[in-house]
């Protein structure tokens, strides 16, 4: 059958919510509101956010400034994703926080 979700174009709502999440994550990292240990979140750039059709899951693409230690940065962000979600929930007023 294959992966049909990647072939379907994103809806306007998915794009709009994805951009909202991207913008707020960028501001959150600049202001270090998530208080993530071991990394300087001011040096993280959010390049893209892809939302699932039900808007309950987001895939966030980030890159550290200069591209150094990308794997380590992603590992730390994944480990402390609960802090990022908590800080993001204070900024966004949507039904389901991805």
Regions found by a protein language model. Name each.
Residues 1-57, 63-98:
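Charge-rich, low-complexity N-terminal segments
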């Amino acid at each position: 059958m294959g992966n049909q979700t990647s072939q379907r174009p994103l809806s306007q709502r998915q794009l709009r919510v994805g951009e909202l999440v991207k913008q707020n994550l960028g501001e959150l990292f600049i202001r270090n509101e998530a208080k993530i240990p071991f990394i300087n979140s001011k040096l993280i750039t959010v390049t893209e956010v892809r939302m699932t059709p039900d808007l309950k899951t987001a895939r966030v693409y980030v890159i550290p400034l200069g591209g150094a230690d990308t794997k380590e940065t992603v590992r730390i962000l994944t480990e402390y994703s609960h802090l990022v979600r908590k800080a993001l929930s204070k900024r966004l007023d949507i039904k389901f926080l991805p």
